[in-house]
Amino acid sequence: AYLFLKAQGLAGKEVAYFHINATNRKAMEERNCRITHIKNENDTISFSYLSRSLPFPVDTIPRWGTKGTARDAVRQVPFMQEMNQEIMKVTDLHGNFRVTIDGTEIGRWDGNELSKGINLAEITCTPQYQQSLSIMYLNEERCAIEKRLRQYMAMQYVFFKHRGLLFADNKAALDAAKAERESHYL
């Protein structure tokens, strides 16, 4: 999958990148996102962040009968560095900071770490990561439904059609399927 995505020209495309200067309360750079309502008061900096895309959820559960996980796979290729970067960079901060999104703590960093940038795509408790997980699970469900429909249609046209039982919902169709289930993929 990594090589396919790279061949499609997705290497180097960020999920989002933003750089905020805390002292002058300005978004210095915004790529594939929008930063608004920047405030810096009472040792708290806050802002609104709207990304135009979601991070890729790196699944930690083996799927499709494999022993490995997507997390294992991304350790073998530079996927996170090339295609899953959602960088939050905040400069002109001193001290240690607790970072929250929608009231949920996502981590603690010092001003130096925040000035280098934090890849939010690596943090699984962010709302945007959780949203992308939901989409991933919905897509897997869609895929399973599509598979069942394809199998049903294949059975209708490959097995039942030449027997004159296309879309037959009767005992004759059931008997035909039972009679040949050992010799076919039914």
Stretches found by the model and what they are:
Residues 2-186:
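Conserved catalytic region of serine esterases and O-acyltransferases that act on ester linkages
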